[in-house]
């Protein structure tokens, strides 16, 4: 079936002692509807919270956490820890494996299995110095993706509050880990005019990609850069490291019809291709777009005026239109919990704009 995009994937979900744990079953069923085989493992504190939840009986919930039965289930392709409590996050960071779920996690770390951790705790625990140490430790492992909680100002108390991000954000992260595109893409030609070291566009992408990496706005393989060219949109490939772009990482989007992206290139285009197409297709040749991830800008409350209402989904027509509307009055868009989009005539001007926005935020804006 067309929507079985996770077919053949085995996902372990480890849920901890947080109120959000009761929302896990619907999310697991959503993953299963896309073809994944999902197993749930709950910590002792989580088991207390979900003890009376009948919905947990209808999923692969490993109640007894029996290590002797470990071989009865398939080896995981990915582990999702959601929600992840203060206690569990710190135990992961320092290597404590005092329960079956934690043993599964540390075993997976040892064999370099992709792991996603979605933090869920109150603002005071999140600001605890132990969390900052744990985040520093976890960030050294490139196989672990850490999803920070969403932090907002309470409308009634005017105080900061934090909660786990939306399940849409978590699902999006899973898809990215498996390099699954949020849209259908069709390759028409494996080569394009930019797949050469001699290409001026490639040289510019390579040069400025390194610059974006150096100012720390395109971490790991996050972000993309694009440019309006004569016969379409040139964009970096999905999974490309912006700081280490090769000629094969340049993809040409020729057209988008019926939500299908038609492209030339050896690799698939960036997951932000629909956004890039809509923002650049009517622009003059040479106009550029950068999708970056500056954490300080992402979590600053000063940017609410140019921030999307909800977590930004790359294939959502309404949200792409929302981005277009924000850009009418602003020179950039803060995609909620999904980075930023800057448009400019030159990469130099975009870099200057990013640095200007960053410097305009005081240390008090740090979360």
Spans of model-derived segments:
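Glycine-rich flexible loops
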Residues: 179-367
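A cross-family phosphate/adenosyl-ligand binding-site feature
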Residues: 1-173
